[in-house]
Amino acid sequence: MIKNRCLDIDLETKEKVLIVDDEASIRKILETRLSMIGYFVVTASDGEEALNLFHQEMPDVVILDIMMPKLDGYGVCQEIRKDSDVPIIMLTALGDVADRITGLELGADDYVVKPFSPKELEARIRAVLRRTNKAAFSSHLTTSGIINFNFLTIDLNKRQIYKDNERIRLTGMEFSLLELLISRSGQPFSRADILQEVWGYTPERHVDTRVVDVHISRLRAKLETDPSNPDLILTARGTGYLFQRITDQHVLKT
């Protein structure tokens, strides 16, 4: 475990990044760069050490390599997602798009393909932390921020969801995606719009739009009664996705 120490800055106020990679050179480069721009950094060289450090340090974001000894990144991601919605960005040298999508399906929020620019990774970290830490979404429909469906309660102010009175855990990115769809319920968002609004990707980045499809699939699996025949998050053919129109009967008045 490696930590940066800076006497002039209270470490408790700094956002903490856990870097997990079996390549010492990558760990060192990222630790140095992220420390210089104000993050508190901890590092792990394999999956088992990563899980131990995760529970000890409670990081604000995890940078996670896929190919590692003892326990690979997929396994680490699965274990973290059992009890945490911390943002996870996966590092992958795997060229197959299917491999990257696997990470997203297991709960990762984003991915960066090796070799990558450290500046790009820094931008991705800022983006996921900004979305995680941003002020609660304010619905134009209700001051309570609570929307009720037959089996689902969405509390936008507390960023909590209950399905049949049972709390459903969403990652920060999943909730941001849901917020976006709800913000214009009944109106479709294109995949490109979603990539730009939620992930901060501009059209010239040429990002695989299946990133959106994977996250929509995960949301449906968690929220819908029948994910294969969704009632809430609908597909707009040839366009993208929309949340079903929210009416006054769905809104809890204050």
Swiss-Prot record:
SUPFAM superfamilies: CheY-like. GO terms for biological process: regulation of DNA-templated transcription. One of its GO terms (molecular function) is phosphorelay response regulator activity. It comes from Guillardia theta. The keyword Transcription regulation applies. Probable promoter-specific protein mediating the interaction between DNA and RNA polymerase. Residues 16-129 form the Response regulatory domain. It comes from the Eukaryota. CDD domains: REC_OmpR, trans_reg_C. Pfam families: Response_reg (PF00072), Trans_reg_C (PF00486). This is Probable transcriptional regulator ycf27. The modification 4-aspartylphosphate is found at residue 65.
